[in-house]
Amino acid sequence: MSVAQNYGTGRRKSSTARVFIKPGSGNISINGRTIEDFFGRETLRMIVRQPLVVAESEDRFDIAITVKGGGISGQAGAIRHGLTRALMDYDETLRPALRKAGYVTRDARKVERKKVGLRKARKRPQYSKR
């Protein structure tokens, strides 16, 4: 007798988030902690809530999130992506609004690897002409 829930997977940088939404009162649980405990910065909490604001459903769902890998910024982006996918799974008519806001597209930017002979990914050693 499981209650109907919708699922979405989100990724950003090296973070992966699994997001489950079900009708409720607006509780957000991330790895068993509240959103306030998990994200200290208000900007990160705002990033997580953005798809709910666009869908005008801040207090309509209880959200359970498991997130792994990366840092806090990447995790917030992964949660936003996963929440967007879960909302689209719940109601496909939300897709155009979420797409217009830019939340549907996976941000494919990753850290570029360091190359041999260079100091960083692109920074070269100083060149001496003479």
UniProtKB/Swiss-Prot annotation:
GO terms for cellular component: cytosolic small ribosomal subunit. GO terms for molecular function: RNA binding; structural constituent of ribosome. This is Small ribosomal subunit protein uS9. The lineage of its organism: Bacteria, Pseudomonadati, Pseudomonadota, Gammaproteobacteria, Pseudomonadales. InterPro entries: Ribosomal_Su5_D2-typ_SF (IPR020568), Ribosomal_uS9 (IPR000754), Ribosomal_uS9_bac/plastid (IPR023035), Ribosomal_uS9_CS (IPR020574), Ribsml_uS5_D2-typ_fold_subgr (IPR014721). NCBIfam families: PRK00132.1 (NF001099). HAMAP family: Ribosomal_uS9_B. Keywords: Ribonucleoprotein, Ribosomal protein. The gene is rpsI. It holds the Pfam family Ribosomal_S9. Belongs to the universal ribosomal protein uS9 family.
